[in-house]
Amino acid sequence: LHYPLRRQRQMCIRDRSNNAKYNAGVTCVIIGLGWNSTKNKYIYADKCKKVNNINYYLLDAPNVIVEHRTSPLSELPIMRKGSQPTDGGFLLMDKEERNEFVLENQKLAPYIRQYMGADDLINGKLRYCLWLKECPEDIMSSCDKLIVRLKNVANIRSNSTKELTRKWALKPHLFTEDRQPDMEYLMLPVVSSEKRQYIPMAYIDSTVIANTNSQMIPDAPIYVFGVLTSLIHSVWMKAVCGRLEMRFAYSASVVYNTFPFPSISDTKKSEIEEAATNVLLARENYPEKTLADLYDPEKMPEDLRAAHEELDAIVESCYPDAPFPNDEARLECLFKLYEKMTANK
């Protein structure tokens, strides 16, 4: 349709752009729907494959629907989202702003905590927040900068369309949703790149405040880290998770709580724990690198890759059909197990 016009005006095809600040992306999916049919079905990936059925996840598998869950299907600990400030940004600050606050009032230093979400976790960024739940009133009232910020928070909340948020205007020094654990926790990013083989995650000290761009498991055993950082868990996430553009959106209710993992013995847990510890030790060889650096598929250090592959083999040995020749076989096993585990629930 456009070819004659392009030829006439000597136009060429180029990258799409728009007026958005960061050039808003567009993802397009074209799907054909029809009645049940006995016609041949094909999946086109690296090559064309004739299949018996194409399910809702574009796999050659039965039409199983993975449904939201409020608790884990498998024997795994509870995962929860980080805390929500609902503050218009006035409880948050960068390093320079943090130093200015402390310079004005040294007593505020213990109440300014590191603040972390997906981007901070993956790319090693440093941000801070005012964490004032145990801060004495006389300290808060002695800092002019803090008083101004809290007034702005109160104003933001009082103008909210949500009644509950308006009530929180009376307590502008507090986060509206406080889920912060008082022990070390395992943090996973809500949104991460689709290019990585493994989900970047790390253990974080309880003094670091997790925000809602992260998922966390308080006091997570090492073997749980091993299961979640494994290839087979990543394959499950890629199949069932939501998307932001093409990036993965990790949800506890859709990904973690639905993940089918068999019941295993204490001996097997110990094997996973040992292999997972080796992954963490391999990371420690590169203190200058961020998780983004370590899990770049083209730059991943060989010792870290080897540690992950050893862990993958042990985690996958928990499943009945292991070893798996490819991700398709992993998914086939996972969906079968999911169907079995949810049959009576």
Residue ranges of predicted features:
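Conserved structured core elements
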Residues: 25, 48, 106, 110, ...
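Acidic/polar loop patches that form or flank catalytic/metal-binding clefts of enzymes
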Residues: 39-45, 157-165, 238
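Basic, amphipathic alpha-helical recognition segments used for DNA target recognition
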Residues: 215-257, 267-278, 282
